[in-house]
């Protein structure tokens, strides 16, 4: 999986890069069956202080799968918690998409009259 990381309003430290890579390792396991053409874009940063008190961090994850774009966003007072929440949400969407694809294959086999595998 190809990963691009960018930061807005904060400096991109080695600790942030390591945290993102560690969290994305879970997603990498889920997308291996889609091939090496899967791209992930992660954006981390601080949000505007317009209506919120204190510092709020935002993490966005975009994963481009064949035929699907997965988007997840999370806000939290802790940057690392926001990264974790966004990656978990993206993982849930990828799992759901994989399940839908499997269901489509089963339906197609039923329609064609072939044997259905469990």
Descriptions of predicted regions:
Residues 1-118:
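N-terminal, polar/charged subdomain of small-to-medium soluble alpha/beta proteins
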